[in-house]
Structures are given as C-alpha cells and as structure tokens.
C-alpha cells in the first residue's frame, strides 16, 4: 500500500432512515434515532481521543483508534481534526492518517490554515512533501492572506521555500 493510498472503511453509518432535515422515518424510528444520537456522541468521543493522540505524536494509539473504525476526519471540541493538530514532525503519523483517509485540505475553523501551512511555518519539509503528494493544496491563503511559502519564508526555512517554489513553478 502506498503512503497516501487510502484504506477502505471508516465510520460509514446507515443514514437512510433520516430525511434531509435529519428527522427519523420508518417503523424503527425511536430505536434508530437513539442509536444515531449515540453514534454522534461516540464519534465526538472518538474525535477527542484521536486528536489528542495525534497532537501528542502517539502513533500506536492513533493506529489502534483508526483500526477500530474511528473516522480520521472526526473533530475535537474545537472543531479541529487529527491531521490539523498532529505533531507535524512525525511523518509516520501523517502517513497513517492519510492512509486512513484524513483530508489534508480541511482549513482550520479559526485561521483558515491548512496542515501544509503549519508544516511550512515549522520547517517540516518531509511532512510538507507527504501532505503535498497526498493532494494538499499549496495555493490556499490563510485568514491573513498568507500562502505556505510565505510562512516558510518568514521563519527562514530555506529548504522548505525552495521546495515550495519548485513545485509551484513545475505545476
């Protein structure tokens, strides 16, 4: 399996019993509605556990949670996913999240930064390259109008700047 090949599965749940307004239809409505609410609560709990493990760089815990079916894009109470809060210098962790389907282009709800902005700002070239190969966009500006290359330049990460300029030029 390639580094960015996504694993099948995740937390796909049957939402056929719910109409577009989210109300329940069908004979098993009470039971299914209760299960749906329970699922949302479980996913929220899983999102907290996954993001906490990712932020701490706990690769084994992240892997175990994903293998148990935790949605790789589940968010914590701040609305951030594991790939947004992960320990950026841990390339193995980034690869695992991406393999399980983490979305590299989800903007931070407050700053609009993508994980590539964070990797560029901190100078993590290997993580940045992996995110880019997984489809991360390099042309998205954060809420201050900065591109990942701007952040790398501000911090003096010359190798990151060179990489970003080269891939943008070759695109």
Curated annotation (Swiss-Prot):
According to the record's subunit comment, the protein's assembly and interactions are:
Heterodimer with CDK4 or CDK6. Predominamt P16 complexes contained CDK6. Interacts with CDK4 (both 'T-172'-phosphorylated and non-phosphorylated forms); the interaction inhibits cyclin D-CDK4 kinase activity. Interacts with ISCO2.
Protein name, as recorded: Cyclin-dependent kinase inhibitor 2A
Q: Where do the ANK repeats start and stop?
A: 45-74, 78-106, 111-140
Example GO molecular function: cyclin-dependent protein serine/threonine kinase inhibitor activity
Relate the protein's function as given in its record.
Answer: Acts as a negative regulator of the proliferation of normal cells by interacting strongly with CDK4 and CDK6. This inhibits their ability to interact with cyclins D and to phosphorylate the retinoblastoma protein.
Please list the GO biological process terms of this entry: negative regulation of cell population proliferation; regulation of G1/S transition of mitotic cell cycle
Q: In what tissue types does this protein appear? A: Expressed predominantly in lung and testis. In the testis, restricted to germ cells in the seminiferous epithelium. Not detected in premeiotic spermatogonia but high levels found in postmeiotic spermatids. In primary tumors, low levels detected in melanocytic hyperplasias. Higher levels found in non-metastatic and metastatic melanomas.
Q: What is its main location?
A: cytoplasm
The UniProt regions of compositional bias labelled Basic and acidic residues, in chain numbering, are 33-42
